[in-house]
Amino acid sequence: MAGHAPRIGITPLPQAKVAIISSSWHLDICNELIAGAQRALLEAQVGTVEVQFVPGSFEIPLAAQYAFEADFDAVVAVGLVLKGET
């Protein structure tokens, strides 16, 4: 398929509260993923964005649960698991 992807309209969300939860492993890659998520959330005019780090990818689901219990509206989960690594 040649051409460009269609542009999707983004609804401003100034009241939204979003947590970006990232593994502390492979920060060189995770930091780029976090930056991309932050750019998208900024474009959507999200009111509150907090970045939280956890030791590894295994802890991300529990941290997401805590974020929702703390009244976050959404969670962006960022992690990288490589075969053979913790």
Language model: regions and residue ranges:
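Glycine/small-residue-rich loop that forms an oxyanion/phosphate-binding "nest" at active or ligand-binding sites
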Residues: A2
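Glycine-rich phosphate/diphosphate-binding loop of Rossmann-like nucleotide-binding domains
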Residues: I8-P55
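Acidic, glycine-rich active-site loops and adjacent beta-strand->loop/helix elements
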Residues: S24, V54-F58, G79-G84
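N-terminal beta-loop-helix "entrance" segment that forms/cooperates
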Residues: E50-Y66
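Glycine-rich phosphate-binding loop
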Residues: A63-T86
